[in-house]
A protein has these predicted regions:
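Acidic and generally charged, gly/proline-rich low-complexity regions
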Residues: 1-174
Length: 174
């Protein structure tokens, strides 16, 4: 997770109720602007994470829920602003540092991942987990890295009339 999230919201895991602790993360306008700047967006119109933190296997915590956001990005072809919606499910497991439930390091330095299996638990220190940073991480992973306006097309290479600078240099040297 990011070191310092623009939408930090820590929960005390020592005091989780048996039914879980519901959390709604809804950033201020200033935090939305910081979130947009952090992720190279034109704007973040809205952002909301509805989460539930519950005890998991005595010492761990499982956080489930959903992140929804409205963002404005720049089209990679036309450079025009385009709107997009983000709606992502969250399920993340946390275990305390030194827990036997954390993924053990392989002594040979190799790690094996089951891409279809559940994610490995994340390790935390202390008594708090930043669920705001978790929501931001899920948000960041859902952003389209190459947004394209509907119908936008890259210009064609043409019929070869314009020669690249390297081709012109090659012609001069030969």
């Amino acid at each position: 997770m990011p070191d310092k999230s623009p939408i930090s919201y820590s929960i005390d895991i020592k005091r989780l109720p048996q039914k879980g602790f519901p959390v709604t993360v809804k950033p201020t306008e200033k935090e939305l602007a910081a979130l947009a700047a952090e992720h190279g967006l034109i704007a973040v119109g809205s952002f909301e994470a509805e989460l539930l933190a519950r005890d998991w296997k005595r010492t761990g915590v499982i956080v489930t829920g959903r992140v929804r956001a409205e963002i404005v990005q720049e089209c990679v072809v036309t450079l025009e602003p385009i709107s997009a919606l983000i709606d992502q499910q969250i399920e993340a497991t946390f275990v305390p540092e030194g827990s036997p439930l954390a993924r053990p390091a392989d002594p040979d330095g190799e790690m094996f991942f089951d891409l279809d299996g559940p994610d490995s638990p994340e390790v935390f220190e202390g008594d708090k987990i930043d669920v705001g940073a978790l929501a931001e991480e899920i948000f960041a992973l859902a952003i389209d890295p190459y947004p394209r306006k509907q119908g936008a097309e890259l210009p064609s290479a043409g019929d070869g009339q314009q020669q690249s600078p390297f081709a012109r240099l090659r012609d001069r040297l030969s």
